Amino acid sequence: MGENMFKKEKVTEYIWTILIPTIITFIISWVGSYYNGTSTVSIGQPTKVSGQYITPINISPYHDIKELRITFPQKLDVKQISSNEPINVKSDKNNIGVESNSTFEIAKIVENNSVQLLITTQKKLNDKEIRIDKNGNNISVNYESQIVNPAKKQLINLIITSSIYFIMLNILALIMNKRWDKYYAKMKNEIKEFEDNAKDLDKKSKKKSEELSELRKTLNQAFEETDRIKYHEKKKQILLLAKLNDYKKELTFWRNTIRKVLYELPDGDKKADKLIGTVTSSLKTYGTVEKNEHDYESLKVAAALLNDSDKRS
């Protein structure tokens, strides 16, 4: 998921930083080329030659120009118009209320075929009053008297183009900065969330570790308590057996004493065995018979060792 998001951000960054500026540059260049390629009509200033005034008009068609109409502020005849190229020029005599003007229509000027018109008049024409009816053609009209210095015009175009580039780049930079701030904030939140999760897991891990340590401690205490109980039980058992050994010795002493007394009577040995057998049978103390005796001396030694061990601890 993170890798896909990274790729998506890369593609978006490529679109905003490379593709869109390229498209905008292309559009600006295309628009500039379009306007620079517009057909132009340049109207020059009248020049006096041999008592007559000659006014030049240069037509530079970027595309075919159809039905171009030119109106002069004087009454003129078609014969007063000369051209360096064969063109069809006719006078428009349907003008109403403009008797002092003359309008001529050029049927067609072929693309990239520059035409120079020379208008011969007796009176000086006011070039600024010569009107061009574009009639739907993409034409730019320039008056020589108003033409600015080419270097100045180039500088103005350069300033305009640079300003457009500056504005567009700043807009793109602003958009990219906002996108970057948004992406940075998103990554910052994800990192914080990851750190919080890591801290939470660390806390849980420490808690589980403490619980496990406490459980081990409890188990160890239980084992120690069990061992202690077993030890004390064994100790009690050994001590009881040792005490039984003392009782047995005392019982054996009295049995032997009674036996000696009975042996002095007639048939004393039989009477002694019968009496002792009767007592043993009545009390069920068969363990006191010598052949069933255990190693009580060893038990007594073990009990003494346990007592010494307890005293040292």
UniProtKB/Swiss-Prot annotation:
Keywords in alphabetical order: Cell membrane, Membrane, Transmembrane, Transmembrane helix
This protein's GO CC annotations: plasma membrane
Localization per record: Cell membrane
Annotated TM spans: 15-37, 155-177
Principal location listed in the UniProt entry: membrane
Membrane topology: Multi-pass membrane protein
Keyword hit for Transmembrane helix: yes
Protein's recorded name: Uncharacterized protein YddM
